Amino acid sequence: KNPNDVIGEFLFLISNLYSSQDNFEKSNFYLNLSNFLNPKFLFNLSLVAENQYSNKQYKKAKKTLEKFKVEDDFYYWYRIKKEAQIISKQRNKKESLNYITAEFAKINEPNNKVIFDIANFYKNSKEYEEAIKYYTKIIDNLDDISEMKADLLYRRGGSYERIGIYDKADEDLLYALKINPDDAYILNYLAYSWL
C-alpha cells in the first residue's frame, strides 16, 4: 500500500475525531490533508458532506453528495439518506420521507442496513405502522439472542406504544429485555409505559 494512502487514512481518523466533537475547523484541516494524500479514499467525501450538513451548508453538501454514484451501493445509500435529511431541514419531513421511500423502492434487494434505515425514517416521521412493518422484516431473519434483535424489538415496541398497541409494545420490550437485561433504555421505556 502507498504510504501516502496510509497517512491519509490516519489523518481522516483525526479529522473524524474533531468532527465528532463539533470542531469543524480542525476537522476540515485534517480532512483536506487526508484528501490531498489519498484522494481515492471515499470516506473523506462522506465526512466532508457530514461537516457541511452539520454547518447547515446544504448546497455544498448536496454538491459533495453528487460524487457518490449509484454503482457504489453503500455510498449511494448514504447519499440518499443525507439528501433526505437535507430535504427535511430545508422543506419538511413529509417531502423527505417521500423522497427516500421513492429511492428505496428502486432497490431490488435491500440489505438489512437499508431496511433498518427506512424503518427509522418512517419512525422519525411518526409513520409507526410502516416502521413496524420494516422492523419486523429484519427481526424475523435474526437469531433469537442477537443484541441487534434486542435493539430492533425496542424500536418496534416503541412504535407499537406510539399507536396504542400496548400489549405488543410490552411483548417486544420484555423480549428485548430478556435478550439484553442490562439495557437502561429498555428498562426506562418499560417503566415509563407502565406508569
Task: Give the positions of each predicted feature.
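Hydrophobic/aromatic packing residues within the alpha-helices of TPR/SEL1-like helical repeat arrays
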Residues: 31, 65, 100-101, 128, ...
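Structural motif corresponding to the intra-repeat A-B loop/turn of tetratricopeptide repeats
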Residues: 21, 55, 90-91, 125, ...
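Short coil turns that delineate tetratricopeptide repeat
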Residues: 39, 73-74, 108-109, 143, ...
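Single-residue signature of alpha-solenoid repeat helices
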Residues: 27, 61, 96-97, 131, ...
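TPR-repeat structural position
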Residues: 24, 58, 93-94, 128, ...
